[in-house]
Amino acid sequence: MTRSIDLAVVAGDGIGPEVVAEGLKVLDAALAGTDVTVRTTAYDLGAARWHATGETLTDEDLAALAQHDAILLGAIGDPGVPSGVLERGLLLKLRFAFDHYVNLRPSRLYPGVATPLAKGGDVDFVVVREGTEGPYVGNGGAIRVGTPHEIANEVSVNTAFGVERVVRDAFARADARPRKKLTLVHKHNVLVHAGHLWRRTVEAVGAEFPDVAVDYLHVDAATIFLVTDPARFDVVVTDNLFGDILTDLAAAITGGIGLAASGNINPDRAFPSMFEPVHGSAPDIAGQGKADPTATVLSVALLLEHLGLTEQAARITAAVESDIVERGSAVRSTAEVGDALAARVAG
C-alpha cells in the first residue's frame, strides 16, 4: 500500500531556499522505487514576510502547519530584523505550540572532516536537549530600565513532568544504541533546585533501563571533555540553556555548523516535528550557489528516521559519509553537492 508523507517546507531566508532545494532532491532520490511518496506545501515564513507584512507566525499558519506529518526548515533571519523578533515570534513560538520538547542534535566526526581536535577519534554522540522549559520560556522581566538601578531577571522553569519526559526519551535512545551510555550534564552543585530535580529524575528513570550506563558531569567539566575526550560521550541529556551551548561546541569539533543537523521533536506525535540545519541564513552568500547543503541533507535523514523510514535515512547518511571522504578540497556549487548526494543515494 502506498504511503504518503505530507511535508511542510519552510525555505526561509538567505541560503535557506538553496539548501532546502537540495535536501528535497535527496529526499526524492531516497524514496525513489519505494511505495512512499512526498507531498510538499511551501510556507512563506521568515524575514522577508516580516518585512512585507510585520507578521511572524499567525494562528492560521500554526493551524495549517499542524496538519502535516513533518516540517523541513531552511534558515530564518536577516540583519534587518531586530534581534529576538523571529527567534521568539517564529521559532520559539512554533516550538512551544507544537510541544517540541526534544531538541535532537547528533554529533559525528566523519572521516576526512577537518577538526580542531589534535586527535579526532571515534566521535559519535547525540545531545538530547530539553526544548520547552528552562530560561527560554520568557518567565522574567525588568524594572527601572535604562537607569543605574535597573533590575533584570530570567527565571529558569523546570517541571517534574517536563524533565521526566525528556530524560525518558534520552534513555530510550541510549538503550537503542550499541554503547548504551547516558550522561546527564547540569550544574547541581550550584543550581541546587533544578539540578537535583534532574539528578533524581535520571536516577528514577534509569532504574527502568538497567542496560544503560549512567554518569554525570557538571556543565563546565563537560565543555572540557567535549574538547579533550569527546569519544567518551554516547547520549547526553541536558536542559535547554546548557544544551544550546553544548551543541554548538559539539558542532565545532565535528566539522562546524555546516555539517550540523537538528530535529525539534514531538515524540508523542501529537504535532509534526521540525527538522533543520543548524546554520543561519548567511545572507552574504545567498543566491551565489556557495552554500553547502550537507546539513540540510542530514536533517532530511533525521526526518526519515523519525517517520520510521530507517533504511532510507541510513542510505542518506552513508552517502554523506562517502561524499565527505571523496570530496577533498574540491569546490562545488550547492546544486553540485546536492546532485552528487542524490546520485549516491539513488545508487
UniProtKB/Swiss-Prot annotation:
This is 3-isopropylmalate dehydrogenase. Substrate binds at R95, R105, R129, D220. The lineage of its organism: Bacteria, Bacillati, Actinomycetota, Actinomycetes, Micrococcales. Its cofactor is Mg(2+); Mn(2+). Pathway: Amino-acid biosynthesis; L-leucine biosynthesis; L-leucine from 3-methyl-2-oxobutanoate: step 3/4. One of its GO terms (molecular function) is 3-isopropylmalate dehydrogenase activity. Its EC number is 1.1.1.85. GO terms for biological process: L-leucine biosynthetic process. The gene is leuB. It comes from the Bacteria. SUPFAM superfamilies: Isocitrate/Isopropylmalate dehydrogenase-like.
